[in-house]
Amino acid sequence: MICYKGKVLTVDSNDTVAGFLVEDKGRIVYVGNELPEQYKNVQTVELGKKVLVPAFVDTHQHMASFSTFHAGLNVMDAESNEEIAQMVKEFVKSSGNKKTLIAFGASPYSVKEGRLISREELDKVCPDKEIMVVKYDGHACIINSKLLDKLKGKVSKLRGYHEDTGEMNQEAFFECSNYITNSLSIIELFKNMQSAIDFQASHGIGCIHTVSGVGFTGNLDITFEKIFAKSLTNGFQVRVFPQSMNVDVALKRKLPRIGGCFECALDGCFGSHDAAMNEPYIDSLGGDGVLYYDDEKVIDFCKKANRAGLQIEMHAIGDKAFDQACRALKAALDDYPRKDHRHGIIHDCLPTEEGIKICRDYNI
């Protein structure tokens, strides 16, 4: 049992700042300004200039993906593609018997070349092992020739396929992601997830909303994350959102919620130039992005999920996708009104006035 003395931010409805917090084996047993007699001989930690706050909640995380990336190579701090190539070269040397490697964090905006590392550059430092370098936004990747040769038959006809640079976007990226996730063993995934949880807890995160269904066969990651969450004994909380447009994926696993990105993504993202826009992009590429589904499909999904009593989340970054999400949720709630539905739209980087009005009127 430990007593913390100092500034304790409770973050309750009144924003109360208490002077004492007592915890016993991870459970808070007292919070207040006067320390009760039974706790006066408890070991005390003086906070001094520090402040005790509740654990943070990460409300949108792809846990299986984050765990995999966390165990791989992080290139986010690289200032050039030459530096990334050198990091990959060293990573290959330390990879042992692994046949497939993963790196994360490539960005054309943080390197002096102003572009993503290319397939040719990856081939020079990693010719004999498959490698996928995931872009910082998680919506695209660059693969080397070894991996391209393995997947060419599956990705060459898909949207977002760029053989010359090795960059994969849209459906081509999803196919690459599916291959990578299915190359992981259950034991390896479990170890990676435990390491990722420990890492997040060490940075003050105590709860995550994980959006699962990132390409594992049979949506294994959804089931696995649910089981993994129940196995945690340190108070860390996990809320699982299955990324599926099939309501049964949630209901069969007795999950009260559904949605996220991947299959529930209505569009892409700005970094990959595929966020769906009401007006065309004004750069040289032009276009208005990618809207993955028509209204009919999204509305049908929302109606089924809402009638099943599920909480719904959908990815919408561009304003065109945001409007579509709002229309679909409105149609679902008009069809079957619910007071405490807790439906939400993820990201919504460019909300429109019309969409905001729907959100306000329907408590989205």
Regions found by a protein language model. Give the residues of each.
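Acidic (Asp/Glu)-rich catalytic clusters
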Residues: 231, 251-255, 338, 359-361
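Carboxylate/His-rich catalytic cores and anion/metal-binding grooves
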Residues: 143, 246-259
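Long, K/E/R/D-enriched contiguous segments that form extended
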Residues: 267, 301-311, 319-324, 350, ...
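Divalent metal-binding segments
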Residues: 2-4, 9, 13-24, 28-234, ...
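Glycine-enriched alpha-helix->loop->beta-strand junction motifs that scaffold or abut catalytic
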Residues: 255-259, 330-332, 358-364
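Non-cysteine beta-strand/loop elements that form the S-adenosyl-L-methionine
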Residues: 62, 257-274, 363-364
